[in-house]
């Protein structure tokens, strides 16, 4: 569906950047939430599970901080809103629901509001 501009409306380089960010969200961020959502797969005792979750949250803070830095002076991850932005928004919603502290990520606050306000995004979420 190239007419849907799922990876943005920019040139090939910008679309490649959207693919890159989609991959980062999928491989790096989403995978840490898998730990938070199912710590029993990684540890048996409740104490060990709590440690695993705390570690995943700490890793997520670092990953989201890197995204926050990238967003400085940008509206979206690449040129125009893309599926990578929608995916990141989903993980930001997970962060809020699971208690990942992103209070230091000021760019992400504005970004989350901006992407959430997009009418096409609102339709799918």
Segments (PLM) and residue ranges:
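Residue-level signal for nonpolar/aromatic packing positions in well-ordered secondary structure
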Residues: 18, 67, 85, 115-121
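GST superfamily/GST-like fold recognition
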Residues: 32-36, 76-101, 109-115
């Amino acid at each position: 569906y190239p007419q849907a501009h799922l990876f943005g409306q920019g040139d090939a380089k910008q679309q490649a950047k959207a693919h890159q960010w989609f991959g980062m969200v999928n491989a790096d961020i989403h995978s840490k939430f898998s730990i938070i959502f199912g710590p029993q797969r990684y540890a048996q005792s409740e104490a060990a599970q709590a440690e695993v979750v705390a570690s995943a949250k700490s890793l997520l803070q670092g990953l989201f901080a890197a995204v926050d830095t990238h967003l400085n002076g940008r509206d979206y991850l690449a040129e125009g809103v893309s599926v990578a932005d929608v995916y990141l928004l989903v993980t930001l919603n997970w962060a809020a629901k699971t208690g990942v502290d992103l209070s230091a990520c000021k760019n992400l606050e504005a970004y989350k509001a901006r992407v959430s306000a997009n009418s096409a995004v609102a339709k799918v979420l």
